[in-house]
Amino acid sequence: MGQARDRVNYSFKRLKEIPEELRPREKLLKLGPENLSDEELLAVILGSGSKGADVLSLSKELIKMGWEELEKKSVEELLKVRGLGLVKALQVKALVELSKRFKGGKSRISIRNPQEAFEFLKDKFDERRESLIALYLDLSNRLLDWEVVAIGNVNTVFSKPKDILFKAVKLSANGIIIAHNHPQGEPSPSNEDLNFTERLKKACELLGFELLDHLILSEGRYFSFREEGVL
């Protein structure tokens, strides 16, 4: 039998027990974020702990809960975590919400006017055929989601209001912007465009949604029903 060795301890260390150069901030600066554990990354965001718990112990406790559980918890419930005060509970909720918005690749951009809608939409259409796109916005005019609702031939695109409203209900959207392109010709509304917009507006009102605008795009230009006073 060899000489007895000191017991190796894999338990989680408190921040003050870690050499300064290996603490989360210093480690991030020297080695990059990919070399930090989840607890260390959260510790960098939280910045400091409290009298009851240092930042690494606090981060470990939060990570152990899991992201889905943190998403469900209210600020009041988070305050029950030992060492987590109001400011840090709000930081955690803000971080979880930000992560949720970026998840899936569709960041929550804001679309507050026809120009911003045009900038978002201008590269979403197939120039060879007419398509109808719907944007779904929340109360703060942030984009919840968007989809191609219908595809037609060179000159026409057909859809029914229910094709647009089904997803609005699913997303609990507040406002809807629709847009279609004119592959050939001016970005001005036809009688069919006007009639469809009126039908959709009435359907939106019945279900408590707001039809914010209808844009027609063609050759780098756009026509906004809202801007022109048609809607």
From Swiss-Prot:
Transmembrane portions of the chain: none
Entry coiled-coil feature ranges: none
Stretches assigned to the MPN domain: 110-231
Motif JAMM motif per UniProt: ranges: 180-193
Cell inner membrane found in the keyword field: no
Binding site for Zn(2+): 180, 182, 193
A GO molecular function held by the record: metallopeptidase activity
Key words, A-Z: Hydrolase, Metal-binding, Metalloprotease, Protease, Zinc
InterPro entries linked to this entry: MPN, RadC_JAB, UPF0758, UPF0758_CS, UPF0758_N
Single Gene Ontology BP annotation: proteolysis
Pfam families, per database record: RadC (PF04002), UPF0758_N (PF20582)
Family indicated by similarity: Belongs to the UPF0758 family.
Name the UniProt record assigns to this protein: UPF0758 protein aq_1610
Originating species: Aquifex aeolicus (strain VF5)
